[in-house]
Amino acid sequence: SFGLAGLRLGYFIANKKFTDTFMNVLQYPYPLSTITIEAGISALEKSKLMNGAVDVIKTERKRIIENLRKYDSFEVFDSKANFVLFDAHGSYKRVFAALAEQGISIRKLGKIGNHEGCLRVSIGTKEMNSKFLLAIRDLLG
């Protein structure tokens, strides 16, 4: 969880059958620029610092999930990522707009599978997450 997706730097670990299928059928890897490679090396050299950031993400993710689950109108999905996905059902457009009015940026995903009103909130700083949770509380009571 080094947060380097924007650089198109990542990896996956899987069995040979899956990696062969992935490489030959689904997607070829992106070529890496020198800047991307240097950023990856720098991130690995700072892994202790990154582990601290991961701990903060885990703590804040748990707090967001627990708070969102207090609202019957939300279906909150378990997460191990640096974001939380939840279905706000028919009120997702209203929730998205109300948060946007307060300068809180989340992702409106809409329909995913059988879920009609999916929203995604990235895990930020404790202060950012508190602002998000307060806005939700003010909106839904």
Task: Name each model-derived stretch.
Residues A98-Q102, K111-G141:
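PLP-dependent enzyme catalytic core of the Aspartate aminotransferase-like
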Residues F77, K108-L109:
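Beta-hairpin "wing" of winged helix-turn-helix
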Residues G6, K80, G113-G117:
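Short acidic/glycine-enriched loop/turn segments that link adjacent beta-strands
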Residues S1-R69, F74-F77:
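PLP-dependent aminotransferase class I/II
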Residues P29, F83, G113:
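Residue-level detector of flexible, active-site-proximal loop/helix-junction positions
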Residues L32, I106-K108:
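Hydrophobic residues in well-ordered beta-strands that form the structural core
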Residues I57-K58, L68-Q102, T125:
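Conserved PLP-binding catalytic core of the aspartate aminotransferase-like
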